[in-house]
Amino acid sequence: VSDLVAVASRWLRLYGLPGETVAARALTNWLEHRSVAVQALDNGVFGPKCENRKASAMFAGAALVDHEPLTNRGMVIQSPDEPLLLLAMVATAFESGTTMIAWRDLDSGLQGLRIEDSRYTIFARSIDRLQSPGQIGANLSCTADLDWETAPVLINDQTLSTRRETAYSKGVELDRSSISILDRWAAAALVPDSERSHDKGAGAGRIDSN
């Protein structure tokens, strides 16, 4: 999960989107609720089950990538807590094809992001289907019980391409409060609190550069 989130956060940052803030919020949400599992839904479709009202994008994205064969039959994410992170995790895993997602923002408006091959477009309103017909051929629905509509593009492909080039040449300014949250939990995860966890725990004391 940490690898997927790290790569997704960097991917978002390259396009001027707040990857580190999204990752910090997703981590905080999961730490508060923790319970996430994959369950079979109707018609052989799979989706994450979470005690929290909103599904953890961290684990929804990880489940999608880990259970690659299942995604050919479909996967449903109901109201992800951080849809941008989920989108980036899926986009970086697929590496090709078309990916689209839509969600409700804090002002009750609809926001969306679309990836088609190497082109990236942000929508004011978008559709509720997240697809990649590439090598994996996955089909993921992302819904929030809304009536979705297609609307004009807010930021065109060239604008995002320029952002990406600027990020590579000039770097980006990170949100330090979000980074401190990630640093705190990284330290807790990488420093075992007992000999037993050091020998037998997840990662067994390995260092993850992400």
Where do the model's predicted regions map?
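Extended, charged low-complexity segments
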Residues: A124-N210
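Aromatic-enriched hydrophobic runs in primary sequence
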Residues: S2-S9, A60-H67, V153
